[in-house]
Amino acid sequence: MLTCKQYELLLFIHNHMKEIGVPPSFDEMKIALELTSKSGIHRLITALEERGFIRRLPNRARAVEVVRLPEKITFNLSSARKISPNVIENNRRKISKNSKNLNNFDIEDKKNVTVPIMGRIAAGVPVSAIQQQTNTLCLPADMISLGEHYALEVKDDSMIEAGILDKDTIIVRRQNTATPGEIIIALIDKEEATLKRYRRNGASIALEAANPHYETRIYRPERIEIQGKLIGLIRKY
């Protein structure tokens, strides 16, 4: 079992190795995890090494390598042109303290959960913009309901009157149905993803912005795939 910080560090080291070819320095790790001292990084490194996720190599600078990633939080993104993250699943049934199945979460004391940030969402972005995991987000477990979840970074003001601002991070439960009035991630023509309020307009689907500068857009049902429902957001000040 990993804590959120341990998993964040493991993923940072893994991604740094893939992109740069060498492990990050302790200073880079400290900055990435927003820690104030290297001692916190040393403790996380030691914990990851004890659990068999990384290995320290003697007599070498930046001598850390990733041995393995936790199986339950390895993300396998579909090559299909839609949002299809194989994300962490949370099932809020009661679990015995001795249970080895933690509902596909790596949880510390069942208080925090880690979900993937799957890119950025705007009024209409190419679906490829939200298919790639860019980071992870640590959340209180009671913020998450049944189902699979992921996060997206908002990059426009089309939903501002619904309280969703540019640079907010939204939490989405993956589902393919919605009730009129709910805010959803919609895939249009398998090409374009957008965050809008879901409405019915006769036999058609209306995607409604929460900003008078954006028009409501009407589509035939076969052009729209619902990819998830908004369940919460996080804002940094």
From Swiss-Prot:
Annotated GO biological process: DNA repair; DNA replication; negative regulation of DNA-templated transcription; proteolysis; SOS response
A Pfam family matched in the record: LexA_DNA_bind
Enzyme class: hydrolase
UniProt catalytic activity: Hydrolysis of Ala-|-Gly bond in repressor LexA
Active site: 158, 196
UniProt keyword Transcription present: yes
GO molecular function: DNA binding; serine-type endopeptidase activity
Keyword Nucleotidyltransferase carried by entry: no
Coiled-coil stretches noted in the UniProt entry, renumbered to this chain: none
Start-end of DNA-binding region: 26-46
Site (Cleavage): 123-124
Assigned keywords, A-Z: Autocatalytic cleavage, DNA damage, DNA repair, DNA replication, DNA-binding, Hydrolase, Repressor, SOS response, Transcription, Transcription regulation
Enzyme Commission number(s) of this protein: 3.4.21.88
Quaternary data: Homodimer.
NCBIfam families: lexA (TIGR00498)
PANTHER family: LEXA REPRESSOR (PTHR33516), LEXA REPRESSOR-RELATED (PTHR33516:SF2)
Family statement: Belongs to the peptidase S24 family.
Physiological role: Represses a number of genes involved in the response to DNA damage (SOS response), including recA and lexA. In the presence of single-stranded DNA, RecA interacts with LexA causing an autocatalytic cleavage which disrupts the DNA-binding part of LexA, leading to derepression of the SOS regulon and eventually DNA repair.
Protein name per UniProt: LexA repressor
